[in-house]
From Swiss-Prot:
Homotetramer. This is Alcohol dehydrogenase. GO terms for molecular function: alcohol dehydrogenase (NAD+) activity; ethanol dehydrogenase (NAD+) activity; zinc ion binding. Reduces acetaldehyde to ethanol during the fermentation of glucose. It is an enzyme of class 1 (oxidoreductase). GO terms for biological process: glycolytic fermentation to ethanol. InterPro entries: ADH-like_C, ADH-like_N, ADH_Zn_CS, GroES-like_sf, NAD(P)-bd_dom_sf, PKS_ER. It catalyses: a primary alcohol + NAD(+) = an aldehyde + NADH + H(+); a secondary alcohol + NAD(+) = a ketone + NADH + H(+); ethanol + NAD(+) = acetaldehyde + NADH + H(+). The gene is adh1. Zn(2+) 1 binds at C46, H69, C156. It comes from Schizosaccharomyces pombe (strain 972 / ATCC 24843) (Fission yeast). It comes from the Eukaryota. Binds 2 Zn(2+) ions per subunit. Its EC number is 1.1.1.1. Keywords: Cytoplasm, Metal-binding, NAD, Oxidoreductase, Phosphoprotein, Zinc.
Amino acid sequence: MTIPDKQLAAVFHTHGGPENVKFEEVPVAEPGQDEVLVNIKYTGVCHTDLHALQGDWPLPAKMPLIGGHEGAGVVVKVGAGVTRLKIGDRVGVKWMNSSCGNCEYCMKAEETICPHIQLSGYTVDGTFQHYCIANATHATIIPESVPLEVAAPIMCAGITCYRALKESKVGPGEWICIPGAGGGLGHLAVQYAKAMAMRVVAIDTGDDKAELVKSFGAEVFLDFKKEADMIEAVKAATNGGAHGTLVLSTSPKSYEQAAGFARPGSTMVTVSMPAGAKLGADIFWLTVKMLKICGSHVGNRIDSIEALEYVSRGLVKPYYKVQPFSTLPDVYRLMHENKIAGRIVLDLSK
């Protein structure tokens, strides 16, 4: 395969809205030590990409930036020292691009909180380009049974909600409450939870999302635009409160309510990060009910392998729509307006 010197990429030079995204010709990078060059075939679009564009997180992003961190493609070149991967391997490029491998966190398989972590599409250029640099240690090998367009959303959305469900400590037959259940992460969380024998209370709005999450195994769907008292509705559905809550909604109000959904002794896992959102937990009831709050922003390398295994076995099926790469600005607009059910996957060939 001939690798070109230049390629098309979606670049933004300043923070702002979809109009700031420009399709430009940029150089194809050379893989360095322990790196590979991946020809990206498909990439998902995540809400984190919107935060990177808008610049509304306290973590600064590099500028100019090529966003994207749900890439699936083929290794076309390997850098010095790479033995794990070879040309032709099908791999995924994730939010976590690399970590140091030597700190106390990496040594405990907690590389997601490595102080030297590099993030695809945020601190380093990501997957909104035809050829992307990936760290050979962190690139995830995609099973042959999983199509690349299916694997793309798993690289962030799937891994993230799978790890968060593990953090919830919810056991078989117990209730997990998922605000934001109809979105890109949420519809996958419903499926992973079902595959892990949890019972699901899904919170979102709209008949299309209700139908979607019920088809994936949610026992209860609560529409936040129709329920007069969401906390009481969750308690009624679960006979006293959920054994765990997974907050995936991008609405700050979800965090104001989430502690109220909880059964005594349960765990609330914070995943989504709406700009400026605060946790609305009454300290008295947090203490008396012995509630636990756990942050979980992404999974590690073994979580990535396990998350793909569920897909390979047919237990999890991303709900997605493939669109041309050229439609990325429109996807940002729809995402900002909360009008996307499931995931949008971009075809880099179009």
